Amino acid sequence: MIVLVGYVLVGNILHLYLFPEQQVVKEAYPIVGDTMVNRFAKERYIVLKTDRETNGRYAEVELHLEPGGAIPEAHIHSNYDETFIVLQGELNLVIDGTELHLGPGEAHTVPKGTPHQPFNRGSREFVGIVRVNPPAQWALFITQFHGFLTEKQEPRNDFEFFLQAMLVSGFYGDTYLASPPISVQKALAFIVAPTARLLGYKSWKLENSLKWRR
């Protein structure tokens, strides 16, 4: 136990203070038109507006989900509300364990701090607008995380997903898994993040932004 505590403390001194992750460069921030494709989850995002276009009020993307597609994991945004607006097809939103069905012209806002996961259980492609208010680092986060999810020819396994989730939860500070409780995830991130860094994981990579640029 003493060895483990020492490893975690020394690891975090190295991770946070002596060798912190590089600050995100300007070129890595998403721009209008960036298009993220995650074939494993049958999803596609097109950036419509970032905080630069809205004077920091909100950010907006066009979301496409093929039949059977879904956002990879139920999750929580602690710093912003997220609104889903259906343009085409149908969207099923599981919100804190309750499933909501939305059709064309309908919209629903998920308040910050609420677990949620969108699905397309229909037989045709879903197309809709997703808007977050305030924008925080959401556009950068989805750009980078989808870059991570699609770096390999096969889907990320649960261990890889966990390591990255624990690392980025501390870096971005606004997106967490639906469970366990956020306080537990923050404690896990403190323990796990140094190991993730040691194994080569990064919260952001320039190439994970540029790959989506058209």
Language-model segment annotations:
Residues 1-41, 50-58, 69-74, 80, ...:
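Jelly-roll (double-stranded beta-helix
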Residues 49, 62-64:
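Short amphipathic
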